[in-house]
Amino acid sequence: MNFNGFLDDGAGASKLLSDAPYNNHFSFSAVDTMLGSAAIAPSQSLPFSSSGLSLGLQTNGEMSRNGEIMESNVSRKSSRGEDVESRSESDNAEAVSGDDLDTSDRPLKKKKRYHRHTPKQIQDLESVFKECAHPDEKQRLDLSRRLNLDPRQVKFWFQNRRTQMKTQIERHENALLRQENDKLRAENMSVREAMRNPMCGNCGGPAVIGEISMEEQHLRIENSRLKDELDRVCALTGKFLGRSNGSHHIPDSALVLGVGVGSGGCNVGGGFTLSSPLLPQASPRFEISNGTGSGLVATVNRQQPVSVSDFDQRSRYLDLALAAMDELVKMAQTREPLWVRSSDSGFEVLNQEEYDTSFSRCVGPKQDGFVSEASKEAGTVIINSLALVETLMDSERWAEMFPSMVSRTSTTEIISSGMGGRNGALHLMHAELQLLSPLVPVRQVSFLRFCKQHAEGVWAVVDVSIDSIREGSSSSCRRLPSGCLVQDMANGYSKVTWIEHTEYDENHIHRLYRPLLRCGLAFGAHRWMAALQRQCECLTILMSSTVSTSTNPSPINCNGRKSMLKLAKRMTDNFCGGVCASSLQKWSKLNVGNVDEDVRIMTRKSVNNPGEPPGIILNAATSVWMPVSPRRLFDFLGNERLRSEWDILSNGGPMKEMAHIAKGHDRSNSVSLLRASAINANQSSMLILQETSIDAAGAVVVYAPVDIPAMQAVMNGGDSAYVALLPSGFAILPNGQAGTQRCAAEERNSIGNGGCMEEGGSLLTVAFQILVNSLPTAKLTVESVETVNNLISCTVQKIKAALHCDST
């Protein structure tokens, strides 16, 4: 595959430059040389070596042949059904007046004309569709006049949009049903295999339990399953109604079912025991005994029976989950005076006095030195309630939905898998919640996640920490009843009410970030809701076949786009893990005397990891306050034409965007492939993979140099797991509403008339990952640390100077 001339500005085919030496990662020597050159002569171009890539333009003959092929394909599709094409394009033929029906001087068959909607028209139509999917004739006429469209075009657009939404929902539901069917088939096969090959529990050899018909075995297994279900339902009913379970015996070991396979007049009756945990788990376990002390065990990867102490612990978990669910629903449905709107931030915050009066604390008394943070946010999300519930109850999918907030998560124990689905599911989970700054430590929380269906299409998912019922458990943060209430709406949307209520030790937080945490912009409901809306919009855009993923013609095919997006996701995840020092990456913190205390330096070794270059990797990160708004700072850092003002990889010149994959209606949410200018005619330019995303709660700009041949393979649909890269980038957050007016005043004093905005300042996190030495056994030197520290300081100063705020 070639890039159709994206890497060369000439009209002819480009020359293969792969013989030029190239290193696609930040290296210690390259950074040191660049910084030295920048310090001596800032106006000169910075040196950088890179390999080449054979990227030729298509000849005119090839383009002509491609045009003929496309034209012939279009004509064949048109002959098969113009009406279908008209509806799939969401375009409509212009209406023909009565005077135009005169066929004396024109062909008998009128020629239809098609019009592609503009992005502005599509945006307005989408906003109306979100509110009303079935507009009446008056609304359609009003839209047609406002958007300069024919009423029939508006009518057909809404018809096609409803059909598209229905198709997407059905596709997703079918996928869920197929997954459930595959799980049931696998479980059925494992059970059949275990029954066909029973094993002796004493000697481990095969055993025969006698002649039992398959129908009888099925009946007894079904009987055992129903008994377990009855026990579990009785336990749940007792908890809901507040009654004791003493009247109904819940077995703590097994259900004994006599089979009667004894022979020869023996007084010892035969039998077998079906052993099952108290609450349903992922897969069954059968223990078969012959009534004489020896047992036959057929195990299918299931836990041991629940002991009395385990049952008592689970009972306490269930009590806590039910109390938390009741509190969450009441808090979500209650407005004033429990929730009041903050005059500083404009968000709904909790009235602590009213909360203490209305609710009893289910997590125990508040610890000394802890501060409370509570917020509430409501909005519509383009996802149905069942899909959102499935995502939240699956730890891996939950982390993928919130990649910048959840660094690591796991399901410790499945206490209850639910009744016929997720209704009643109760999981014990552990998570690491992060804010993209080295000045805010990762929050380690262990909590229960309980899911309950309150009505048709209405679900609630609640989290609550288990510190109050687990002995010896203590942390610097705990979650009070928090979660979301989800209600289905028309057109595949859901109304989500999100509540976040936490208590944390503020002494571990840097003073620069304390206002941000107090007003709920760091871990509050506003940030969770913004991230959910952006991620769901991204998934909808990428799954939609009618939305173009590139604003310009691109040589990337469908498989290439998927591979490129997968590579960008890995790059962003590694960047977040480096900023927050996630436990997934084995970072070791370095304490260097001549490094500023707000700059965190870490190191680790990379060995046998195809996604990273081998050797010693150095990570430097810091956070600073900037007297500019988050949006202005994001637009500056994400603009490829302005990278030469701060990026040493730009070689002192502007970069060119070669490919652009949109991930949302806002063009800023995208993955781009950039080309840096070559230093001289004898060297080829380098490629930079960049992902940018922004929502109402913050923004990130992540980039990494990539190897040109490897990137060419990725754009052809190759496996991106073997592309080695080291990410760097920026995380942008608002400064905290408590100091908005002060920050806005300082911004006016610093910037003057150069773009003052009322939102106040921003909190900018800068992070670099650099390959110091390609030998994993090499030792780290003080000079390497000083070079990385100088790099991060130089970058911050360049950004301040470019935005005219270097005096702050």
Swiss-Prot record:
For whether the record's keyword set contains Lipid metabolism, the answer is no
**Source species of the chain:** Arabidopsis thaliana
Pfam families listed in its UniProt record: Homeodomain, START
Query: What's the name of its gene?
Result: HDG1
The entry's protein name is: Homeobox-leucine zipper protein HDG1
List, alphabetically, the PANTHER family matched. HOMEOBOX-LEUCINE ZIPPER PROTEIN HDG1, HOMEOBOX-LEUCINE ZIPPER PROTEIN MERISTEM L1
The record, for InterPro entries, names:
GLABRA2/ANL2/PDF2/ATML1-like, HD, Homeobox_CS, Homeodomain-like_sf, START_lipid-bd_dom
**Stretches assigned to the START domain:** 310-541
Please provide one cellular component term from the Gene Ontology annotations of this protein.
nucleus
Basic and acidic residues composition bias: residue spans: 79-90
Principal subcellular localisation of the protein: nucleus
